[in-house]
Amino acid sequence: MTSIHVITRDNRAGYTDVLEEYFRLRHDVFVEERGWRDLARPDGREVDAYDDDHATYLIALDGGRVIGGLRLYPTLRPHMISQSFPHLVRDGRILRGPTVLECTRYFIVRERRMGRADCRLLAAFQEFCLEEGITEVTAVVEMWWLPRWHQAGFKVRPLGLPTQVEDQPCIAAAIRISEESLHQVRRMAGLRGPCLLREASPLRKVPHVAA
């Protein structure tokens, strides 16, 4: 059974091996599979400037093995859209705020993409954001993500026009966080309730405002 773990600076010391596997899988997916050669590293770990203490990870585990994950980052800090992709946003108006996060490095391992792992991670994404008071999440994605999000019940608005990135048409978009979207994606994932796992003692709410 797939479980989705919330990893922050508060508990990442207990997830050292999990994060190491996640970073190596990111290299496999984004460098080796998708061909994003600018991200290649000789140690086989895809790590960047946003893998710092402000990052929150939702990691999908099955039998102790990482099968997927994503990274969330506060938009009141310099983040990927503001630093690398401002040209993808109409009029350069970067969507920021204490209730807005950026999502990057989403993946499901190749052998699990035909099952429900993808929908479970998307459900965990909506669940986490609702719990944290997040209203929207921004992302730069390939265009084929839009029908997938629509099928999952996500409400998405473009922030600009499609642009070629790494030889793929990509778009900056904002996902609205809502109970309605959570209920629909839970149904698709075969879930009857919450799917997030946090520490045994409840984590304090994740800080989204730049310290």
Q: Where would I find each of the regions flagged by the language model?
A:
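Short, solvent-exposed loop/turn elements at beta->coil junctions and helix N-caps
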Residues: 42-49, 160-163
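Short connector loops at helix/strand junctions that flank enzyme active sites
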Residues: 53-55, 65-67, 96-101
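Acyl-donor binding region in acyl/amide transferases
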Residues: 80-170, 174-175, 179
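Conserved GNAT-family N-acetyltransferase fold
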Residues: 58, 70, 106
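A short helix-loop-beta-strand connector motif used in the catalytic cores of GNAT acetyltransferases and
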Residues: 47-58, 80
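Short amphipathic alpha-helix that is part of the acyltransferase structural core
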Residues: 1-46, 57-59, 66
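Short, His- and charge-rich active-site/binding loops that engage polyanionic ligands
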Residues: 61-92
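Charge-rich, low-complexity intrinsically disordered segments
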Residues: 168-211
